[in-house]
Amino acid sequence: MAEIQHLAICTKNNRRLARFYQLIFGLEESWNRFQNSPYAFYMSDGYINLNCLQIRPGSSYNRMVDGQEIMPDAGINHIGFTVKSVKDIEQRLSSLNPPVKLVASPQDGRYEEWRITDPDGTIFEIAEGGWEAGGPERLPAIRYVGIRSEDPERLASFYKSALPIREVNRVTDPTGEARAIFLSAGKTALGLLKKTSASKNGFERVGFQVGSIDEIKKRLHNAPPYLYPGEPEVSVMTAPSADPGKTLYLKDPDGNIVELSEEGWIA
């Protein structure tokens, strides 16, 4: 089984974003003693390693287009899977049509070893060594990541072929077309959600299993400051009935969707 153990959110203020997740969800800093970088701010729930990654010129996640460096937008940028055998993943990728090649990650002390691009152009990473996540495991904990796609079926087929993961649930419309396909990736579910007119392809949301949603509401109200003057208040909201996700969610200070659930996700 390939396990999601890493999530990176690109941001223009990594300290502020890390502060929010520490104050509201109790994530703790996870120190990477091998990577001397002010741009990667690693947080942990005891199982998942969350990188609040500073957007900057020269990042390996930037793209060159017509000679211009394009930096990523603020938002969820990529996930990382811990795998038992990179060689097995390489064989899986080579058997795809067309074949997909592993791309080596920069060797500067970061945890990931290889990068892969899915059919929608979304990056994910793999590593045999995994990501440092501290411990012990606890709640609140990241237990879900959601990706929007024009074709969830195609994307599900790719991930199930490229990685040792399996489908555990799906939501369909009256015609039988998939609105959401959920894959098991260790203790964390990967959701492939049908793109809507109001959304765009790529990573869209993260989900926290929490002991008490009321406690999260109290923390949002009583926590020390994590917003700047004039920024909108963060509050727990109810999702539209057509949304295939959980009923309750919030948006972090950067606008990322964070689903909330006491029962968790099937994984």
Regions found by a protein language model. Name each.
Residues 1-18, 76-79, 129-156, 168, ...:
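N-terminal beta-strand motif that seeds the catalytic metal site of vicinal oxygen chelate
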Residues 1-2, 8-57, 108, 146-190:
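Core segments of cupin and vicinal oxygen chelate
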Residues 12-16, 71-120, 149-153, 206-257, ...:
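Vicinal oxygen chelate
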Residues 43-47, 116-119, 182-187, 250-253, ...:
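Active-site beta-strand termini and strand-to-loop segments that position acidic
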Residues 51-53, 115, 125, 191-193, ...:
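Conserved beta-strand in the GNAT
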Residues 115-134:
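Short, structured interface segments
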